[in-house]
Regions:
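Extended hydrophobic leader/signal-anchor segments used for secretion and membrane insertion
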Residues: 2-332
């Protein structure tokens, strides 16, 4: 083959390779922009939203509806790992910024966010959680006998939400086949007894009641009487439970709250971890950044979220308020 033909063929391949490289780069760039600014897909990893949203469901997170949260680190994780540093240096962290959104955050929204209780990792590297939004900044929230009360209005149970039940089944009618037919996926028999603990919707509870000819089904009240060790509701000796607590005022940006030794535990994580202050309590006196205080003004908005699987959800009742800078987006 003549030399000039070889050169032409080689030049043709170079040109095709260049075109493909440009096309792939543009496509990857567009996908990255969509992922960062518009949408993200997520597989639900827990049962905390059963039966409204199920474990294994694929959901689409809309980031722009609340306003896209801009990237919070200069260097991607890959560069930190390549340098052999497993920590994320402070100089790589960017301040929290969010673009204008098309929607306001509202009661009952399904919100995806980074888990606020992981204080050892950058916010955007914390695990994704999905919950229902119960209370907004400035709302007054309480819970009585498992019913949330927001600004004096008692919320109805959500249609597909689950609660824990005790089922006494002396004739062993409730077997695996029955559970499968009723789509009951959580709970089981207490070893060596005819008692089952099941997480059920109201319709499932009604079906169980019809099936068992003897025995009984009733709400599992052990959760009400059981202290949740080290949880938000138990800090500072506050004897609240998952089903009965409050009232609590949800912190809002620029809201000023009185502080004392009785309520400081509710706001400790906000003051120290989310708003980066030093906090000390000495002889019933409170010091923030070495200054005596009896009040505090919040720098951000906060929210209260909960899972529809009421007795099997790690949510604000366990780890506290959700800061606005942890919110990723909305799903439906």
């Amino acid at each position: 083959m003549p030399v000039n033909k070889k050169k032409k063929k080689k030049s043709k391949y170079k040109h095709l390779f260049k075109e493909w490289a440009i096309a792939i780069s543009i496509s990857l760039g567009l996908l990255l922009c969509i992922h960062i600014f518009l949408f993200e897909m997520m597989i639900v990893q827990s049962t905390s939203m059963e039966k409204t949203i199920r474990k294994g469901d694929i959901i689409v997170i809309s980031k722009f509806r609340y306003g896209t949260r801009l990237p919070q680190r200069i260097l991607p994780e890959i560069f930190c790992r390549a340098s052999g540093n497993r920590e994320y240096p402070d100089f790589t962290q960017l301040p929290y910024k969010r673009l204008p959104g098309s929607d306001f955050i509202s009661h009952n929204d399904f919100v995806v966010f980074n888990y606020p209780g992981d204080f050892n990792r950058p916010i955007d590297k914390r695990q994704h959680y999905l919950k229902r939004l119960i209370a907004l900044p400035g709302d007054t929230l309480s819970c009585k006998k498992g019913f949330f009360i927001v600004n004096g209005q008692t919320l109805s149970k959500f249609p597909n939400s689950q609660s824990s039940y005790k089922v006494y089944d002396p004739k062993d009618i409730i077997n695996d086949s029955v559970l499968k037919s009723l789509d009951i996926v959580e709970g089981g028999t207490i070893t060596g007894s005819s008692m089952l603990i099941l997480h059920l919707t109201q319709n499932q509870a009604d079906s169980i009641k019809k099936i068992i000819s003897s025995g009984y089904i009733k709400p599992n009240k052990d959760f009400s009487n059981q202290a949740v060790e080290m949880s938000f509701l138990q800090k500072g000796g506050i004897r609240w439970t998952l089903e009965d607590f409050g009232p609590i005022i949800i912190p809002a940006k620029k809201m000023n709250v009185h502080l004392d030794t009785h309520n400081i535990a509710l706001y400790e994580d906000i003051i120290v971890h989310h708003e980066n202050n030093n906090l000390e309590v000495k002889n019933d006196s409170i010091f923030i950044n070495n200054t005596f205080v009896d009040s505090y003004t919040f720098k951000m908005n906060y929210y209260f979220v909960a899972g529809d699987n009421f007795h099997n959800s790690s949510d604000s009742r366990i780890w506290g308020f959700l800061p606005e800078n942890h919110i990723i987006g909305k799903t439906s």
